[in-house]
């Protein structure tokens, strides 16, 4: 499970349809990471984790964004 409380979102990048999103975020210990989220139009409860997330820690937002773009097919840098 992803802990959404202990992070500062640096960027939230949505697809054109607004149904998928990648968050680039910094944790309390300074780690920069990314994870992918989705929402379903028939489910009003909001965003849900897809389970796709960074396998490494990045030094900055730009590095995390570039790494996410290599993994997430709809994401463009």
Regions found by a protein language model. Name each.
Residues 1-2, 42-77:
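Mixed-charge, Lys/Arg-enriched low-complexity segments
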Residues 1-19:
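Negatively charged, low-complexity tracts enriched in Asp/Glu with abundant Ser/Thr
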Residues 5, 17-18, 25, 37-38, ...:
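Intrinsically disordered, low-complexity regions of eukaryotic proteins
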Residues 6-11, 31, 51, 73:
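Intrinsic-disorder/low-complexity peptide segments enriched for small residues
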Residues 16-19, 30, 59, 64:
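A generic structural micro-environment signature
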Residues 21-48:
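A short, structured beta-strand/loop element
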